[in-house]
Each structure stands twice: as structure tokens, then as C-alpha cells.
UniProtKB/Swiss-Prot annotation:
It comes from Arabidopsis thaliana. Transmembrane segments: none annotated. Belongs to the UPF0725 (EMB2204) family. It comes from the Eukaryota. InterPro entries: MS5. This is UPF0725 protein At3g44770.
């Protein structure tokens, strides 16, 4: 098994993260394949050193909430493994999407205008769900100042018939001293209208419904809110989620139409874009193919928490 996985890794058909997941499921230690935790190979350790490094690993995880692990510690089989990208290497497209989602969540919470720049490192954990502790370098468009964000993003299993489910647990400026524990999303605190099975189409108007529930996004909205393009790229990724090369080959996306549906009946229709809970019906084109997507954004009202549930269908080739 190890030889087969090693061959798949070497030829690029298997990512480190996927291999981690397979090994965790088999109950093996990731070091059996010498998977890189840093750009340099980490030497083996004795049992006494393992015990000491396990304590150091726990200290680093506890103090940084999983964001700062130096790569020299002994990583448990199902622990948080660091990936260092350096100055010139880009992350996988999936990780970049998650980093941008964290910046978007922070901007909503703090009413800031941080711009995603790059990801110098991220840490990944399996196997119950894919959790990414992502360090993101950003630029504040208000004063052109640089900051470092820390985002905890989790891709979990489907709960409501969605193709892709992604949630944020932490979206913060990197603290100088250790902060609070991780606070998970409270599903029961989400508005009932946005819970349950994912819708496939725009809801029909009932007798008591108000047309103010719906807003068709205008071109100027897309220009002013780059996260609408992020949601559209997430929609494309949802369709190609098992083929990242296929996803990358279809970029960029061309937004055709977006309908926002929300229970918040703002008198100014454009304000629906700022609703904490909303459903986005997105039609877009990518690589001469038309797609339709339903993306549901919800929150439990706590800072740093967003849940995205996405279904996407390919309609036709143009």
C-alpha cells in the first residue's frame, strides 16, 4: 500500500492532504511515507524525543489554536499537519478559496475592506472533516496597511443534500498573545427558514410573501462586491470538487445572473446583499459551458462564523 501511495504522490495524481486522509483511515502514521511537513525532511526521533515533542506539539496547538506549528514536532497520525509555502509557492486552488472566504467573513464582521494577497502557510487536519488553519496576508484598502489574518475553515460532509459544505470557525487578525478557545457553529441558532434540505429553485411567492424578499444583482453590485465572484468560483468548485485540475481549467467564470433571496425585507433592495442569511441563485458560464448554482449563506450570529452550502448543475455547452 505504501509503495502505491508513494507512486501516486510522485506522479502528482495524489495530494499530500488526500494521502494524509487515506493513512489516517488505515491507522498508519504519515511519516511512513515521509510526507513533507516543511520544505526540508524532518529526521527521525527516539521514543523519549517523541514524548517530549508530543508535549511541544500540544503546547503549540493550544497556544495558537492550531495556526502556528513549527514542523519540527512529532505530529500525531490524526493531528494538525503544517504546510509551508514559502515566498513564491501558491496553495492549491481549494485552499486559496478557503483563505478568501475567511477574508470575506472578517470584512462582514468588522466592516473592513481587507484584500486577499497570499497564503504563506496553512495547517490541515483529518479525518472527521477537512479543517484548514490558514494564515493569510491581506492589505487594508482603507489605508494601504498590511495585516496577517488567521482563518479556520472546515469542509465537512453533506447534511442537507448539498454538494459542498464549508464553514468558518475563526476569522481574526493574528493576535500577539494567545486568545480564546475555538467556538463551533451553533446550527440550532440559524434561522429556521435557512435550515433543512437545500432548495433547487427560487422559492415561489405565497399569499403572504413580499417581493422585497428578492433582488436581482446588478453589474455595479458585482464590481463593488468581489465576494459575489468568490461565491461563483465556489459554485464552480462545487461541481468540480473531485477534479481540481478540471476546476482550474474552467476559470475564469462569467457571471450571467444572480438572484438574492432573503427574509430580510429591506426597503433598499441592494441591502439584501448584506443580509446575514441569504440564498444566492447564480447562473454563470465557464469554459463555454453554462451552469446553475444555489448557494446558501447562513450564520449563527457569532463573529467569525459563516456556513456556505452549495449545489451546482451544468446546463449545457455554448
Amino acid at each position: 500500500m505504501a509503495d502505491i501511495l508513494r507512486q501516486l504522490l510522485d506522479c502528482g495524481k495524489l495530494s499530500d492532504e488526500t494521502c494524509h486522509s487515506i493513512l489516517c483511515g488505515l491507522g498508519q502514521h504519515v511519516d511512513a511515507l515521509h510526507l513533507s511537513k516543511t520544505e526540508e525532511e524532518v529526521d527521525g526521533w527516539t521514543s523519549e524525543e517523541d514524548e517530549e515533542l508530543d508535549q511541544e506539539y500540544c503546547r503549540q496547538v493550544t497556544e495558537s489554536l492550531g495556526f502556528d506549528i513549527d514542523g519540527k514536532v512529532c505530529i500525531p497520525a490524526c493531528g494538525i499537519s503544517p504546510v509551508f509555502l514559502g515566498a513564491n509557492k501558491n496553495p492549491r486552488s481549494e485552499v486559496a478559496l478557503y483563505g478568501r472566504l475567511g477574508v470575506h467573513c472578517f470584512n462582514i464582521d468588522k466592516e473592513r475592506k481587507f484584500q486577499y494577497m497570499r497564503i504563506p502557510k496553512y495547517n490541515v487536519q483529518y479525518p472527521e472533516a477537512m479543517s484548514f488553519h490558514i494564515t493569510v496576508e491581506v492589505n487594508d484598502l482603507a489605508d494601504n496597511s498590511a495585516h496577517t489574518l488567521q482563518n479556520l475553515v472546515t469542509r465537512s460532509f453533506s447534511r442537507n443534500g448539498e454538494d459542498l459544505r464549508v464553514s468558518t470557525g475563526i476569522c481574526r487578525i493574528k493576535p500577539k498573545t494567545p486568545e480564546r478557545e475555538i467556538c463551533l457553529v451553533d446550527e440550532e441558532a440559524i434561522d429556521k427558514f435557512y435550515r433543512g434540505v437545500m432548495p433547487n429553485f427560487v422559492s415561489k411567492l405565497g399569499a403572504d410573501d413580499d417581493k422585497l424578499r428578492f433582488y436581482e444583482v446588478q453589474e455595479q453590485d458585482v464590481c463593488a462586491n468581489d465576494w459575489l465572484r468568490l461565491y461563483t468560483e465556489f459554485a464552480l468548485f462545487s461541481y468540480w470538487r473531485y477534479n481540481e485540475d478540471g476546476f482550474e481549467s474552467c476559470l475564469p467564470v462569467e457571471i450571467k445572473k444572480i438572484i438574492v433571496e432573503t427574509c430580510d425585507t429591506h426597503r433598499e433592495p441592494r441591502m439584501k446583499l448584506k443580509s446575514s442569511n441569504a440564498i444566492f441563485h447564480i447562473n454563470f458560464n465557464a469554459k463555454s459551458c453554462d451552469y446553475k448554482s444555489v448557494s446558501r449563506r447562513t450564520t449563527d450570529g457569532k463573529p467569525g462564523h459563516i456556513v456556505l452550502e452549495i449545489n451546482t448543475w451544468k446546463l449545457s455547452s455554448t
